[in-house]
Swiss-Prot record:
The gene is cobF. Keywords: Cobalamin biosynthesis, Methyltransferase, S-adenosyl-L-methionine, Transferase. Signal peptide: none annotated. Pathway: Cofactor biosynthesis; adenosylcobalamin biosynthesis; cob(II)yrinate a,c-diamide from precorrin-2 (aerobic route): step 5/10. This is Precorrin-6A synthase [deacetylating].
Length: 261
C-alpha cells in the first residue's frame, strides 16, 4: 500500500496478446491509474504497443486518465557479455522509468505499466522498478497484478497439460536447453530461443509444441515429433519473422505421453 503523499505504481499483466486475456483485477487496476505508460519498440514492433492501446480503449472507463508512450532502447549485444548487456539495458530503462515517474506522475498519483504476459515470468519490469526504488530519487510504492502467460496460452492452444502426472517441469532458455532435455527433464519449456535449439534435439521420441504470436490474430501453432516437424517450424518461423518484422515464440518439449493410454 502506498503511504499518503506517495506515488503508487501498478505493474499489470495484460496477457499474451489477446485483449480478452485481461482479468477483472487487471481491468480494475487500469481504472485506478491516473497515467498509463505504454512502451514502444520501434517501427517493426508497432503491434505490441497497439495491443496495449486497444486494451486501454476497451477497458479504461475513467475520463481523467491519460496514456504516456515511451521508447524502449535497443539492448546492445556487441562487445559485451550477455549479463553485462542486460545489466546496462536495465540501467537505461530504469533511468527512463525514473524520469517518467518524476515528470508525468503527481506526488500522490498512480501510474500503471502494462506488461506482456505476467510480470513474474521472463519479464524484467519488477527488477527494473526495484532498481528505480533503490536509487531513491523518486519515492513510490508498487503492486503487481498477475496476467495470463504465453506458457498458459501455448498449452491451451495445443490442448495439453503443462506437466506429466507427478513429474516436474523445467522452464529454461534455448542457450541452456542442452543441459537438461531429455536426459534430466521430461518436460522443458523454452521461453527465449534465438538459436532454435530444438533442432539439435536428437531423441526420436521427443515431441514439440510450438507457438508464435500466441493470443494475437497472427497466432501460429505446430506440434509433432521434433524430427518430423522441426524443418516446418524453422521455415514457418523464418517466413513469419520476415513478414512481421519480429517474432515472439515459445515451445514445450516433451518426452513421454501427455495422456494415459
Amino acid at each position: 500500500m502506498a503511504e499518503a503523499g506517495m506515488r503508487k505504481i501498478l505493474i499489470i499483466g495484460i496477457g499474451s496478446g489477446n485483449p480478452e486475456h485481461m482479468t477483472v483485477q487487471a481491468i480494475n487496476a487500469l481504472n485506478c491509474a491516473d497515467v498509463l505508460f505504454i512502451p514502444t519498440k520501434g517501427a517493426k514492433k508497432t503491434e505490441l504497443a497497439e495491443v496495449r492501446r486497444d486494451i486501454c480503449a476497451r477497458y479504461v472507463t475513467r475520463k481523467d486518465s491519460r496514456t504516456v508512450e515511451f521508447a524502449v532502447p535497443v539492448r546492445r549485444t556487441e562487445g559485451v557479455s550477455y549479463d553485462g548487456s542486460v545489466d546496462d539495458w536495465h540501467a537505461q530503462i530504469a533511468g527512463i522509468y525514473e524520469a517518467l515517474l518524476s515528470k508525468e506522475l503527481g506526488e500522490e498519483g498512480t501510474g500503471a505499466f502494462l506488461v506482456w504476459g505476467d510480470p513474474m515470468l521472463y519479464d524484467s519490469t519488477i527488477r527494473i522498478v526495484e532498481r528505480v526504488k533503490a536509487r531513491g530519487e523518486v519515492a513510490f510504492a508498487y503492486d503487481v497484478i498477475p496476467g495470463i502467460t504465453s506458457l498458459q496460452a501455448l498449452c491451451a492452444s495445443h490442448r495439453i497439460p503443462l506437466n506429466l502426472v507427478g513429474k516436474p517441469v523445467e522452464i529454461t532458455t534455448g542457450r541452456r536447453l542442452h543441459e537438461s532435455f531429455p536426459e534430466k527433464s521430461q518436460t522443458s519449456v523454452v521461453m527465449l530461443d534465438g538459436e532454435q535449439a530444438f533442432q539439435r534435439v536428437e531423441d526420436p521420441e521427443a515431441e514439440i509444441y510450438w507457438g508464435a504470436y500466441l493470443g494475437t490474430r497472427d497466432e501460429i501453432v505446430i506440434s509433432g515429433r521434433v524430427a518430423e516437424v522441426k524443418d516446418r517450424i524453422l521455415e514457418t518461423r523464418a517466413a513469419a519473422r520476415a513478414k512481421m518484422g519480429w517474432i515472439m515464440d515459445i515451445y514445450l518439449l516433451r518426452k513421454g505421453a501427455d495422456f494415459d493410454e
